């Protein structure tokens, strides 16, 4: 994930944007930090999903095929 300093800066810029607005440089920094945050979040979510196995009440593996295929691609 993103460092706590970067997350704090994202929150600081969001708060400032609501109160008084951002300069052009701050707006660019905010966009760049948010892009980094979203990329880190997506990578983390994909790793979490690759650890998931869906089992129905009868004990059958009903993991979606798309997820199974994604897991196989990751291993190769």
UniProtKB/Swiss-Prot annotation:
Pfam families: DUF896. Belongs to the UPF0291 family. Gene3D superfamilies: Helix hairpin bin. It is found in: Cytoplasm. This is UPF0291 protein Aflv_1503. InterPro entries: DUF896 (IPR009242). GO terms for cellular component: cytoplasm. The keyword Transcription regulation does not apply.
């Amino acid at each position: 994930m993103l460092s706590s300093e970067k997350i704090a800066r994202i929150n600081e810029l969001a708060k400032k944007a609501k109160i008084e607005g951002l300069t052009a440089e701050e707006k660019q920094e905010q966009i760049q930090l948010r892009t980094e945050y979203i990329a880190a979040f997506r990578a983390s979510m994909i790793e979490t999903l690759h650890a998931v196995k869906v089992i129905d009440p009868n004990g059958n593996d009903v993991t979606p095929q798309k997820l199974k295929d994604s897991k196989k691609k990751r291993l190769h």
